[in-house]
């Protein structure tokens, strides 16, 4: 990470896409995408996804590391080119508990991530706990972030500290996506970014963390990008002009969250304007979902009814029976909720892919279509972009390969934005 930031600050057009997903096919797609390059691949876990208690994936930080490295071994991707990051590390999961308790758990969380070898740490203490005022005073936010940083510094070995980096900042979207529709988005003011840096610097120095300050590479801000279930707010460079100019006076860059579904030209403009770390998550699993739905249509054309995976029916039944991950996000009317379940840009379906019934049905879908030779015309009908790559001999007509390539369509847009080459 430090090398990428140094190159960006020296004037090179370079950024990095942060892959925020725990889905094995997404991680495989990301690693295969850069297998033949020298690029680093940044893969991040969030605190509610992976923590010392297991998170919703059931994985602790060391488990997630092993999970990623096992996929890398299968792919043949060198582990030294993987950067592991932790996102929203702080009291996010424990906001309903008293601050003292939540912070103790947050410190243990940070220690677990650093001990597992994660080298990019987002120190996020912005959320109010049960006995805190709302909103939290910026000084308290910085003070808590400094305590989290201190835990990381005490845990990291000297060798780890050579690669350890921190991200600070509080203006982040709701982890996991917006719960309601959005009309507009507030672009962070330059003076607010400056105040964030100033309060954090003071809090770090108060704890004797001067050396750690040198490891702070980015500030999280809102450049004016967001999405909800049905709409996307696209980047408007002129709105972020002052914010973009201010960061040039620091050794840091910006980290932008919720950059999913922006155009490839927007990613290029964001990196040009020093939003050099671009986080993406739902757009990747949205592409995965599109691929699986397309394959389900192909299966209906090719496979006898009694032998089909019925993946769409299984997904619907599981999500309707277990609505915990989508109920408070989607529209209440049944017909509208079904559209949201299937097609919402916030992609709450991503939480259900590990469900045993859904996982088994997806495996059967892939097995069915691997055994059946996929006709080119059928691929053209449901996956036209992949059909074009098949015609260019860039892709095999296998369901697994088609899914990965569909996910990589998203990564291609980020590569265009983050690379000095525009091909």
Swiss-Prot record:
SUPFAM superfamilies: Aldolase (SSF51569). Pathway: Carbohydrate metabolism; D-tagatose 6-phosphate degradation; D-glyceraldehyde 3-phosphate and glycerone phosphate from D-tagatose 6-phosphate: step 2/2. InterPro entries: Aldolase_TIM (IPR013785), GatZ/KbaZ-like (IPR012062), GatZ_KbaZ_carbometab (IPR050303), TagBP_ald_GatZ (IPR023436). GO terms for biological process: D-tagatose 6-phosphate catabolic process; galactitol metabolic process; phosphoenolpyruvate-dependent sugar phosphotransferase system. It comes from the Bacteria. Keywords: Galactitol metabolism. GO terms for cellular component: plasma membrane. Forms a complex with GatY. Belongs to the GatZ/KbaZ family. GatZ subfamily. This is D-tagatose-1,6-bisphosphate aldolase subunit GatZ. It comes from Klebsiella pneumoniae subsp. pneumoniae (strain ATCC 700721 / MGH 78578).
